[in-house]
Amino acid sequence: MKRSGVGSLFAGAHIAEAVPLAPLTTLRVGPIARRVITCTSAEQVVAALRHLDSAAKTGADRPLVFAGGSNLVIAENLTDLTVVRLANSGITIDGNLVRAEAGAVFDDVVVRAIEQGLGGLECLSGIPGSAGATPVQNVGAYGAEVSDTITRVRLLDRCTGEVRWVSARDLRFGYRTSVLKHADGLAVPTVVLEVEFALDPSGRSAPLRYGELIAALNATSGERADPQAVREAVLALRARKGMVLDPTDHDTWSVGSFFTNPVVTQDVYERLAGDAATRKDGPVPHYPAPDGVKLAAGWLVERAGFGKGYPDAGAAPCRLSTKHALALTNRGGATAEDVVTLARAVRDGVHDVFGITLKPEPVLIGCML
């Protein structure tokens, strides 16, 4: 990192030049950015983006906006990049309403809610990244999604510069998606400034729905448990799968699950189930979905020949986690191209075997599958 200082154009936000982005992402890949503007308040975020977006209309490059860097793959050749980093991290609680600024560490939000006796977020414990990223792709795990509890989101409209609250109903949440999700990470039309959650003040968790978690708690489906006990069970399950970031463990340097679980028609599921029975491959893990049948992407990946730790060559800079076949991990020296190359191989291999195309979950900046 070279020069740093405070930017008067950006309401006092901190500006640093020549900043390596790899340490700011959970995958630990990325270029050296031309400058990073770190905003510790919503006012700084709005001021910075209004100025930079106005400049972009006259030919300047649009900035990349992120906070925790947990869902990004950024190409190393983007050396002229300007980054607006969200570090506005306030968390406020009013009764059963929890409001988290975009840069708040999401797991800190979960902890604060549980400490206040509020249920609803405990199944999402240990998910890396910021609160502001959660509504964008409707983050979920262990039978829960943030759409279960989000009431509204405060947004900056980058086209008009307007700041407004938008109700959950208008966010059109779906499986790992919302109206906020955009394929081009450099052309995102809105930026989340704050998220509001309405939680259960009863002191009990949301109803348990996920079989593995239910078994770990020795509970029954639909039971409401102690939120802290649920959190501890979830963290233990995530740790066993390498899904809790550990800076000393390359097996956790990832974006989490790289591919979403595909939703297929009933006919496609029945074909796969029949083929699996013929091969004596065991039952096909599946779950009901509003528009079909949701399959377990990890099962497809492993049955297509990509086992945990693939490729086995110890020198491979990017490999599947040894604990979870959906996590593509940086073994210490991987580039974005290494990650994308492995992702392509896995995606194409699954398609060749099953005729199903897996879709990536992270945002790809300057690279594509």
Curated annotation (Swiss-Prot):
GO terms for cellular component: cytosol. One of its GO terms (biological process) is cell division. Its cofactor is FAD. It comes from the Bacteria. Its EC number is 1.3.1.98. The active site is at R176, S257, E361. Pathway: Cell wall biogenesis; peptidoglycan biosynthesis. The keyword Magnesium does not apply. It catalyses: UDP-N-acetyl-alpha-D-muramate + NADP(+) = UDP-N-acetyl-3-O-(1-carboxyvinyl)-alpha-D-glucosamine + NADPH + H(+). Keywords: Cell cycle, Cell division, Cell shape, Cell wall biogenesis/degradation, Cytoplasm, FAD, Flavoprotein, NADP, Oxidoreductase, Peptidoglycan synthesis. It is an enzyme of class 1 (oxidoreductase). InterPro entries: FAD-bd_PCMH, FAD-bd_PCMH-like_sf, FAD-bd_PCMH_sub1, FAD-bd_PCMH_sub2, MurB, MurB_C, MurB_C_sf, Oxid_FAD_bind_N. It is found in: Cytoplasm. Residues 29-202 form the FAD-binding PCMH-type domain. GO terms for molecular function: FAD binding; flavin adenine dinucleotide binding; UDP-N-acetylmuramate dehydrogenase activity. Its main location: cytoplasm. The keyword Repeat does not apply. PROSITE patterns: FAD_PCMH (PS51387). NCBIfam families: murB, PRK13903.1. Cell wall formation. Belongs to the MurB family. PANTHER family: UDP-N-ACETYLENOLPYRUVOYLGLUCOSAMINE REDUCTASE (PTHR21071:SF4). HAMAP family: MurB. This is UDP-N-acetylenolpyruvoylglucosamine reductase. It comes from Mycobacterium tuberculosis (strain ATCC 25618 / H37Rv). The gene is murB.
